[in-house]
Amino acid sequence: MKIYVDADACPVKDVIIFEATNAEIPVTLVTSFSHYSNAEQPKGVETIYVDSGADAADYRIMQLAKKEDLIVTQDYGLASLALAKGCIVLHHKGYKYTNDNIEQLLQTRYLSAMVRKSGKRTKGPKPFTAEDKEKFRALFKSMIAL
């Protein structure tokens, strides 16, 4: 198993790196050049930089990921593609994407886009909380222990 992180706006990178390095599982952070950092990463953690274009990180993750790799993303489109490839996919708020829930998530995203396109406003996501982080940590640890 390898772990790939859609890292541009991922609030749980520290959890992923800590837990994965303790379990000696390699982590690849995929992020755009606009988030460049020369901070040193722990052994087993690699950062891949991609252009800032729409979905560039998603495309790179899909090139790299293999069946049964673990992907962390908040992007429903990437989650859908990764599920079809046989990957394990987690959201940073502590839930697992599945073939059972991805259709509903994609449909909700589409309907919200249509509402916004018509000039109306939609609610954004709820703020990320410490409880969300701990929920993610518990789920992540259970997934890498398999």
UniProtKB/Swiss-Prot annotation:
Superkingdom as given in the UniProt entry: Bacteria
Cross-referenced InterPro entries: UPF0178
Coiled coil ranges: none
NCBIfam families reported in the protein's UniProt record: PRK00124.1 (NF001095)
Family indicated by similarity: Belongs to the UPF0178 family.
Protein's name in the database: UPF0178 protein BC_3040
